């Protein structure tokens, strides 16, 4: 591999997050450059954060040297992908491993986005204060410098085995129902923040029994104005009576008031009307960045839609995928249908793979996303919203006040899934078994405050090593359901023509 190595900073479009992350980026870059020099390379830095696709095209496109992207916070995938797609120079994605500064989340999203467009990239990560002192990181970096790629252990990636007759029968029934009536996804916008890996489109959705109907988010600005005040007041009374705890007017959230919650409920009702108008089965909702300065955050609305107890509801959830992510929408809708076919509540949670650590000899991931986690994760009473807490979304990211749909996830066995696009253009369903784990209060609070305290929390064993997730997982998002529906999902995915990949230590 060539001696010269270009080091660049993938960035957020928003200036504030980049400003906050600059000290971390500088420190990590200094350590990375020291490591590269130690390995006999000559690193140089591409100027500044890449905050728009055109900057990636202009600054990365002309570079033929090997390249390293340094991820220390959330970054948009096109700020890397658009500058390197179609090229074959060695590319390494290198991230920190921090809950507070989620570079690993951006690495997972960018790696999956690169895979979906057929661009090879290697991955390396470290939680060490000094990257040069992490032996495992240095070993991976040395391998990349020597060969242009890193080959990670793949022993926990498997083909699925045979499934039992009962699971096959349920899968066959769900597949037949989809054959009779195609799943219609209402898409409010296309992806969010450049999540290339989260958009499939009709060419990939039609063959697996899905269709999408796109509605511009601008409709919401108009539609929510015509919602009758009486409906908003009834919805407001409903969520209070059902047990939601609202954290209005707390420090750093003085502008989060009952009126802000009512504005969110008005938006929820407008979306409910759109779902009814188009008779859609499920929903993908972009929100960011288009509505950021116009309407309150969508998170409380999404949490309600993913709950059985909701205003003007029918006793069932409406599967809702935040950030219009079809890679989670597909498995969430399929898991809901399998659960209901098994006579179980059709609740499926949407989360980010945010951070992880050892606890009592066991690796646990903190799964944490501001939207799309329903109340069933926090209590097992389908008629209640107890355990739901609504905090103001952090104002540094969300200027219009509005609340989240947070809580502590119950312990229990889980099945998890994710659909992604491989470099040949085909769909793959990742599946695994795991467990939602109850942590001691002090540990949970420390982990929660080390990430984002306002968002719903799950500590989960995903049934495979952290190295397998970091090296091979093709998203920062994951769909989680309580119970064991692994075999049914294997059979259903195969029936619909989706290739299955199992992630498991056994």
Predicted feature locations:
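Metallocofactor- and cofactor-centric catalytic cores in central/energy metabolism, strongly enriched
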Residues: 1-119, 124-139, 154-186, 191-282, ...
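Anion-binding alpha/beta catalytic cores of soluble intermediary-metabolism enzymes, centered on
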Residues: 101, 105, 112-115, 124-142, ...
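Long, internal scaffold/assembly segments composed of regular secondary structure
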Residues: 231-341
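Residue-level signal for secondary-structure boundary elements
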Residues: 149, 342, 500-504
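Active-site proximal loops enriched in glycine and acidic residues that flank catalytic Cys/His/Asp
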Residues: 9, 286-287, 350-354
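Intrinsic low-complexity, intrinsically disordered or marginally ordered coil/linker segments
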Residues: 143-156
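C-terminal catalytic subdomain
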Residues: 309-444
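Extended hydrophobic packing segments that form well-structured cores
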Residues: 389-506
């Amino acid at each position: 591999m060539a001696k010269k190595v270009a080091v660049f900073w993938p960035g957020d479009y928003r200036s504030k997050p980049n400003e906050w992350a600059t000290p971390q980026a500088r420190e990590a870059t200094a350590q990375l450059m020291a490591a590269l020099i130690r390995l006999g390379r000559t690193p140089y830095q591409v100027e500044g954060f890449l905050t728009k696709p055109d900057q990636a095209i202009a600054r990365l496109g002309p570079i033929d040297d090997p390249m390293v992207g340094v991820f220390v916070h959330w970054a948009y995938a096109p700020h890397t992908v658009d500058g390197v797609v179609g090229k074959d120079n060695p590319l390494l994605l290198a991230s920190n491993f921090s809950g507070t500064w989620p570079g690993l989340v951006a690495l997972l999203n960018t790696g999956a986005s690169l895979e979906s467009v057929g661009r090879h990239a290697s991955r390396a990560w470290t939680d060490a204060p000094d990257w040069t002192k992490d032996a495992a990181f240095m070993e991976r970096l040395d391998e990349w410098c020597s060969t242009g790629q890193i080959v990670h252990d793949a022993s926990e990636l498997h083909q699925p085995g045979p499934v039992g007759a009962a699971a096959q029968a349920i899968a066959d029934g769900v597949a037949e129902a989809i054959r009779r009536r195609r799943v219609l996804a209402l898409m409010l916008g296309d992806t969010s923040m450049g999540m290339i890996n989260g958009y499939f489109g009709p060419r990939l959705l039609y063959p697996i029994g899905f269709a999408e109907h796109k509605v511009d988010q601008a409709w919401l600005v108009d539609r929510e104005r015509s919602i009758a005040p009486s409906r908003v007041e009834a919805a407001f009374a409903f969520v209070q009576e059902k047990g939601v705890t609202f954290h209005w007017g707390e420090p750093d959230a003085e502008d989060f008031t009952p009126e802000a919650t009512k504005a969110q409920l008005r938006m929820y009702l407008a979306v409910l009307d759109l779902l009814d108008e188009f008779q859609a089965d499920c929903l993908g909702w972009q929100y960011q960045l288009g509505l950021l300065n116009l309407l309150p955050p969508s998170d409380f609305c999404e949490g309600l839609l993913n709950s059985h107890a909701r205003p003007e509801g029918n006793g069932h959830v409406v599967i809702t995928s935040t950030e219009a992510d079809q890679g989670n929408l597909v498995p969430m809708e399929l898991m809901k249908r399998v659960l209901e076919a098994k006579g179980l509540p059709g609740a499926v949670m949407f989360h980010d793979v945010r951070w992880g650590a050892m606890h009592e000899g066991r690796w646990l991931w903190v799964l944490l996303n501001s939207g799309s986690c329903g109340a069933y994760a926090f209590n097992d009473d389908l008629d209640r919203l107890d355990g739901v807490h609504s905090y103001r979304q952090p104002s540094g990211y969300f200027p219009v006040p509005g609340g989240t749909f947070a809580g502590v996830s119950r312990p229990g066995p889980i099945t998890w899934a994710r659909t992604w696009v491989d470099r040949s253009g085909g769909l793959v369903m990742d599946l695994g078994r795991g467990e939602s784990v109850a942590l001691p209060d002090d540990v949970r609070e420390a982990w929660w405050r080390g990430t984002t305290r306002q968002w719903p929390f799950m500590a989960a064993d995903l049934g495979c090593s952290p190295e397998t997730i970091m090296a091979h997982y093709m998203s920062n998002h994951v769909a989680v359901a309580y119970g064991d529906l692994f075999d049914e999902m294997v059979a259903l995915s195969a029936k619909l023509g989706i290739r299955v990949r199992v992630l498991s230590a056994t």
